[in-house]
Amino acid sequence: MKTLLLTLVVVTIVCLDLGYTRKCHTKNSPGRETSQACPTGQNICFKKWKKGEIISKGCAVTCPKPKKDETFQCCLKNNCNR
């Protein structure tokens, strides 16, 4: 009985995937935007503007630091960088 219970617990853990994965919108070229699961450890979604135009979206470990003429918006919910 204990073996059966242990087997069921292991199967449940594998099926549920207890590791949570953030989903963010990604955009690397004009008109090409999708939602994807972020790599492990990248739990921040960001949106990057340059001179007022959105030029990229994606996942990050920390909110990126803007360079000249760049602005970043970062958030912590799934697909919050729409």
From Swiss-Prot:
What family does the database annotate? Belongs to the three-finger toxin family. Short-chain subfamily.
What protein name does the entry list?
Mipartoxin-4
Keywords per UniProt: Acetylcholine receptor inhibiting toxin, Disulfide bond, Ion channel impairing toxin, Neurotoxin, Postsynaptic neurotoxin, Secreted, Signal, Toxin
Q: What intrachain disulfides are recorded? A: C24-C45, C38-C59, C63-C74, C75-C80
Quote the tissue specificity entry.
Expressed by the venom gland.
- Subcellular location, in the record's words? Secreted
Species: Micrurus mipartitus (Red-tailed coral snake)
Q: Name one Pfam family in it.
A: Toxin_cobra-type
Tell me which positions the record assigns to the signal sequence.
Answer: 1-21
Explain the purpose of this protein. Answer: Snake venom neurotoxin that blocks neuromuscular transmission, presenting a postsynaptic action through the nicotinic acetylcholine receptor (nAChR). Has no cytotoxic activity.
Give the main localization category.
Answer: secreted
A single GO CC term for this protein reads: extracellular region
